[in-house]
Swiss-Prot record:
Oligomer and partners: Homodimer.
CDD domains with a match to the protein in the record: M20_DapE_proteobac
Reaction(s) catalysed by this chain's protein: N-succinyl-(2S,6S)-2,6-diaminopimelate + H2O = (2S,6S)-2,6-diaminopimelate + succinate
Lineage top rank: taxon: Bacteria
Record gene name: dapE
Listed GO biological process terms: diaminopimelate biosynthetic process; L-arginine biosynthetic process; lysine biosynthetic process via diaminopimelate
Protein's name in the database: Succinyl-diaminopimelate desuccinylase
Active site: 71, 137
Glycoprotein keyword on record: no
Name of the top EC class for this enzyme: hydrolase
Binding residue positions for Zn(2+) 1: 69, 103, 166
The organism of origin for this protein: Rickettsia africae (strain ESF-5)
Cofactor: Zn(2+); Co(2+)
Length: 381
């Protein structure tokens, strides 16, 4: 059934933060199979409204929750997709093409099939199975999983263990389980000089040489050596702007944006202090003014592998005959919110085609993921 579920889910044009009926489809399906469901819509305005779902079968512990998102990123040029449509499924050579196939409608389809089959085959299991789904993970993530977790806990629900269905595997299904994530902090630096004629530089103060020196130092600084589970923290310049299209004018100001992905040796605040010390030093030397802004959407985190995390890894190894590596690579995810409530793993399909034109998953990979999810429910419940 996971193939049918995936085909149906791909058909919903659920570009962030819209559900476009995807969450309603899952809600109806789970309700038909005895789940207690609730859809909540959060958001400050109509354009920001986010659709969320919590569905649970059973009332006993442990409550094993699948956490995921139905929203997808923009599909780009539709003409470049199979069937010229990212939201119309194309099945070729054992693969299913469509936006969201791996990120992450494929994982949702597999856990739907696994949980419904498990409930059908095990009428007296000891715990509960639940879903927490949102239509805003790829965007601001303000009114999605974070807000929904707080809501369900206020209602008296408790999650004992979560599986976040992000596409975590690198080369084959089962080679990686994420137990943490790097943090992310964005910076915007504005440097104010004094404009003037290029022939009279002594009557002006060009902010660009100062910016170049600063960015050169920042991009070459070694923030750390990494840790057992984390790679080195990394800074990337993402944008440089100079509002000057005239070749004989020294610009008055310039602006640069950069991002740091960081491990658990840092926080956004400590990095901001380190960055500002470098900026302050050079701006003083060049006698220019600066303004530095920063914002962090996620701090880094790492979990010590709990018994349930180890049990999940054993199920992966037993099912797929591959020993998974505990990993923290990749971008941010909603796991950063879930970890405040319960132990978790992130485990899903291959990440190779996520967000790309002609995103696809192999049907054989869907079967492997279904098997892992089903076997874990058998083992833990």
């Amino acid at each position: 059934m996971y193939i049918n579920y995936l085909k149906d889910l791909i058909g919903f044009k659920s570009v962030t933060p819209k559900s476009d009926g995807a969450i309603e489809y899952i809600n109806d399906l789970l309700k038909q199979h005895g789940f207690k469901t609730e859809i909540k819509i959060f958001g400050d305005s109509k354009s920001e409204q986010v659709t969320n779902l919590y569905a649970v079968f059973g009332s006993n512990e442990p409550n094993i929750c699948f956490v995921g998102h139905v929203d997808v990123v923009l599909a780009g040029n539709h003409e470049l997709w199979h069937n010229a449509s990212p939201f119309k499924v194309s099945q070729q050579d054992g693969k299913i093409y469509g936006r969201g196939a791996v990120d992450m409608k494929g994982a949702i389809a597999c856990f739907l099939a696994a949980s419904l089959d498990f409930i059908k085959n095990n009428t007296d299991f000891k715990g509960s199975i639940s879903f927490l789904l949102t239509s805003d993970e790829e965007g601001k993530a303000k009114h999605g999983t974070k807000e929904m977790l707080q809501y369900i806990y206020d209602q008296g629900y408790k999650i004992n263990f979560a599986i976040v269905g992000e596409p975590t595997c690198e080369k084959e299904i089962g080679d990686a389980i994420k137990i943490g994530r790097r943090g992310s902090v964005n910076f915007k630096l504005n440097i104010e000089g004094l404009s003037g004629h290029v022939a009279y530089p002594h009557k002006a103060n060009n902010p660009l040489p100062c910016l170049i020196i600063i960015l050169n130092e920042l991009t070459n600084i070694k923030l750390d050596e990494g840790t057992e589970f984390f790679q080195r923290s990394n800074l990337e310049v993402t944008n440089i702007e100079v509002s000057n299209n005239t070749s004989n004018v020294i610009p008055a100001s310039t602006e640069a944006s950069f991002n740091i992905r960081f491990n658990n040796l840092h926080s956004a605040e400590t990095l901001a202090k380190q960055v500002e010390e470098i900026i302050k030093q050079h701006c003083k030397e060049y006698k220019v003014d600066y303004k530095l802004e920063y914002s962090s959407s996620a701090e880094s985190f790492i979990q010590n592998p709990s018994d349930k995390i180890k049990e999940f890894a054993k199920v992966v190894e037993h099912t797929l005959k591959i020993k998974p590596e505990f990993s923290t690579s990749g971008g941010t995810s909603d796991a950063r919110f879930v970890k405040n409530y319960c132990p978790l793993v992130e485990f899903g399909l291959l990440s190779e085609t996520a967000h790309k034109i002609n995103e696809y998953t192999k049907i054989s990979d869907l079967q492997k993921l279904y098997d892992v999810y089903y076997n874990f429910l058998m083992e833990i419940l």
